[in-house]
Amino acid sequence: ASIIDPNAQLTTALLQTYGDFSLMDTYRSYITGFTQYYAGGWNVSNYAGAVYPKDSEMALLWNRYYSISIKNLVDAIYRSEDMPNTNAALRIHRAYMMALLSDIYGDIPCSEAGMSYINGNATPKYDTQEEVYNFVFSELKAAAAQLGTGTDLISGDVTSLESDVTAWKRYANTLRLRYAMRISDVAPEKAQEEFESALTADGGIISSGDEDAYVKYIDAPFTLYDGANDLDFRANALGEMIYGQDPTSPSFVCSTLYKYMETMNDPRLYRIARCYIHTTRSQTDTSGNYDVTDEVIAWGENGGLGIVPCNVGDAWWSDWVNAPATSDIPTLANLVSLYPEKGYDQNNYPARMIRPTIAVAFCNADCPGILITYAEVEFLLAEAASKGWNVSGSAKDHYEEG
């Protein structure tokens, strides 16, 4: 078609957020490694873990998000001035994407980005990160005020907001809380001003789990490295990437994160970190994983090593651990007995199963792509209270609610 519906462009940009397989290896290889969330998999150990820079890999997030999401959003914003609600939703997601890219890369083209076809500017200037964040705050406030001023339906919405202008307004206000807190160490007065302004903004903020904002995905087959199908954004590609593409290299939990949560008695630890026998990890059906977390813990309580997370920069086979005997893990013993030809006790699978990985529940194709949640709001309010900002409730109460 000679004219593209701006709502179709909104759908594309929203789905790409978590659905673009082509860029997700950068999250796994670098971002999760630098933050010491993951370790052990070949990619994260050899790139972030070993501090091995690969420009083409590190540039993927920018190259893909800019060429697809940003360009579509800017073009659709330009052509949807007679669609106030859709235009506002497009502006909100552009603000989300610009903040994301600036958080990763720092100074980026923002105010002039994506305008080449519109005004001929093929060399947009780089805005400083401060300018990017000021742009984001301004856009979120303006877009929230614009919502509800038209009668058009946000038909391209594929999020939990479900085309509801009041939900989009609430979402925009809530994002302001996040970005205000992000700058609180470098611009504390500006941060407090933006935060407190968002709290009292028309439309309110997310105030329950039912109001969480996320992109919806479907239970579609994983695309893996399937050529043109990488442009199919309907499944959660980040979940696919975290799951892994072969039995030997899923995303193991880094010892830094694991031990911190363990020391703090964090009740979320075993919701996030699980131990599996997963000889079928190369297949797209996640049902081929046998959860043996409780059995590995019991083995540790009876003199075995128990759960052994991977250390920073190590592959899962580094700092080699002695696997439990087949008889120590009842599920393993049962599988070996029932299916001796499948090699459950071979190829070092028993050694790998005591390395905790990300729970498969977070790796399904239809897992939601989180934009912002009520839990994060409560943590932000807790931090604001601890800073002495003008928020109701104590830091302790907000933290525990989160």
Residue ranges and their predicted role:
Residues 1-36, 46-50, 59-60, 70-71, ...:
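Acidic, glycine-rich segments characteristic of secretory precursors and extracytoplasmic regions
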Residues 40-93, 97-402:
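Structured, solvent-exposed acidic/aromatic patches
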